[in-house]
Regions:
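N-terminal secretory signal peptides that target proteins for export/translocation
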Residues: 1-10
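Bacterial N-terminal signal peptides
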Residues: 15-25
Length: 301
């Protein structure tokens, strides 16, 4: 039995989404923290000098207007990213959910793949580097979601946040995203100097109770948590732990993310698209997934 991995139409589509997701009655709560203002402590990374408040970032979209998620709202919520995919293309919306809150909905058009045509990507750059960080968020794939060959999900990064076949050297950066694979199987997707191939290292998430690989269930909210601690330069003592709906599903304690102290954990990569870099990864129909309740905080190293 496998064990948890140890290395040791006629309406705008956002209106249709609201009708799909909510048995009506849109809430009017105003709990948004990410978009309060660019100088707000909770809008990005303004509390890192406050030892009593380890929070780096939070976003729950309760103050965001329903409809297309604009470039202006992205800038306000996510510490002014320098670039993005999917925002100007209107593939991201704020919608009402079936649990009485607001969430981001990301659309993947039919017969597309890659971030230029499909999904959304941007980077939240922290205002400081951190040695150990926890990132958590809620995610739901729409009912009947067609997983195809798989696609990307968010995660932490450092330095230039290597992706796209850019294997880290130890002196440039790393990334620690996720993927879904066929049938919704969950894997960690790591770019780090010791990865075995050019493209990211896929490490299965394993249910500690059943020994089976974790799967995302369409139509159900899941809570994902990543806990990453950077290594001492040139040493294999970095750690990565992952939790799925409260269960630990990944525990690695011998990772080398860097050979220099020029970077540590520097940001969070909101990355979701089908692919893969060729048409074998494309969607077979329009698909949608939802994100909510992002929380990123410092943790003990």
């Amino acid at each position: 039995m496998l064990k948890p991995v140890r290395f040791a139409h006629t309406k705008p589509y956002w209106q249709v989404l609201i009708l799909i997701l909510l048995p009506l009655q849109m809430p009017e709560r105003t709990l948004l923290q990410a978009g309060e203002s660019s100088s707000s402590a909770t809008s990005s990374s303004k509390h890192q000098s406050d030892t009593a408040t380890p929070q780096i970032f939070s976003a729950d979209f309760e103050n965001a207007s329903y409809g297309i998620y604009t470039k202006e709202q992205l800038s306000l919520d996510w510490n002014n990213p320098s670039w993005s995919d999917g925002i100007e293309e209107k593939r991201v919306s704020v919608v009402a959910t079936n649990r009485g809150s607001r969430a981001l909905a990301v659309t993947f058009p039919a017969h597309t793949y890659g971030p230029e045509k499909n999904g959304a990507v941007w980077r939240l750059k922290f205002d400081a580097s951190y040695p150990a960080v926890e990132a958590r968020f809620d995610v739901m794939f729409k009912q009947g979601f067609g997983f195809a060959r798989g696609g990307k999900l968010p995660g932490l990064f450092g330095g230039k946040g290597n992706t796209g076949g850019d294997k880290p050297t130890g002196k440039d950066g790393f990334s620690a995203r996720m993927m879904w694979r066929e049938d919704g199987r969950a894997v960690q997707y790591l770019y780090y100097p010791d990865q075995p191939d050019r493209y990211g290292h896929q490490i299965p998430w394993i249910d500690p109770t059943t020994g089976k690989q974790i799967k995302f269930q369409p139509g159900q909210w899941h809570t994902v948590v990543h806990q990453l601690a950077i290594n001492t330069p040139e040493k294999n003592n970095g750690t990565l732990r992952a939790f799925f709906d409260g269960k630990i599903v990944l525990d690695i304690d011998n990772l080398r993310f860097r050979d220099t102290d020029d970077f540590a954990i520097d940001g969070f990569l909101l990355s979701t698209f089908f692919g893969g870099g060729d048409a074998s990864w494309q969607t077979t129909a329009e698909e949608i997934l939802f994100f909510d309740n992002f929380r990123i905080r410092k943790i003990p190293n």
